[in-house]
Amino acid sequence: MEKRPLAGKVALVAGGTRGGGRGIAVQLGVAGATVYVSGRSSGSAGSDLGRAETIEETAALVDAAGGTGIAVRADHGDPDQVRALVDRIAADRDGRLDVLVDSVWGGDPLTDWEHPLWEQDLDRGLRLLRRAVETHVITSRFALPLMVARESGLVVEVTDGNTARYRGSFFYDLAKSAVIRLAFAQAAELRPHGVAALAITPGFLRSEAVLDHLGVTEENWRDGAVKDPHFAYSESPAYLGRAVAALAADPDVMAKSGRALATWGLYGEYGFTDVDGTQPDFAAHWADALVDEYGPLGDPL
């Protein structure tokens, strides 16, 4: 494969501040893309998540990786801000947008893992849906016309899990499942216009928040397996990023449009590895160590 297969391409990574979004943005940069990184957490104004990561840091990492990173603060729940973001991309890049990645989430502090629906705070749950689903709809509504006009492009909806298996919390499950349906519906409507849309999930992702929770860093992450043995089978955000970069560089990606994909189902086809040279396969680990306790992972949607 070419070393910079996305040179000259323009991408928008919505929710690129941290975690999978950051990993995707950086790996698109490695592949040579110009990457607009958007989100609420900026050096000039933080979000209510209270984390240190910023869109400017991600853009700098894109630059360091060999791409061009451009940070634009935008709340993707605000249609006016998203419209302005897309208008800027259109003006800057002569109407070009080749890759749209929607990794907006922000639902961690709103997810209730302890209670069934009828005991949950309704306002909190609906806020989660607005952050995790409505933001994706708003972003696509304004970004898709750029792709349709050029009759090419790829939409990537980032989710958690790619099967019908229940994800452990009502609103969390509803949000992550809805993102898969967003990809499916967009694929159906975009196919006549030459634009592909798909969903993708990582396995056990070593996000900044997970590393903090386990008291480790990316450098000594294996020590986290002392607290959670399954963490030994985790994957870095770069692994997800390399999967998305491979999809974006695939001239036959339309064949995957409408599907819910996973990192573990793509590394064999595209040959990418994680940063340590391994190829984590969460589905295989589930089958080996988790199926007896939790049941089958299920077939991809």
Regions found by a protein language model. Give the residues of each.
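Short-chain dehydrogenase/reductase
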Residues: M1-G95, W105-P116, L297, L301
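Active-site loop of short-chain dehydrogenase/reductase
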Residues: K9, G67-T68, G95-L97, L146-G161, ...
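Rossmann-fold scaffold of SDR-type NAD(P)-dependent oxidoreductases
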Residues: A14, L97-P109, A132, E157-T159, ...
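A glycine/serine/threonine-rich, flexible loop-to-helix segment
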Residues: G50-R51, H115, P192, F204-H230, ...
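A short helix-coil junction within the Rossmann-fold of NAD(P)-dependent oxidoreductases
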Residues: D92-D94, G107-D112, F142-E151, D250
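Amphipathic alpha-helical dimer-interface segment in Rossmann-like NAD(P)H-dependent oxidoreductases
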Residues: W105, R127-A149, T163, A187-A188
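Catalytic loop of short-chain dehydrogenase/reductase
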Residues: G106-L110, W118-R124, L128, L154-P192, ...
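C-terminal helical subdomain
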Residues: A199, E219-L301
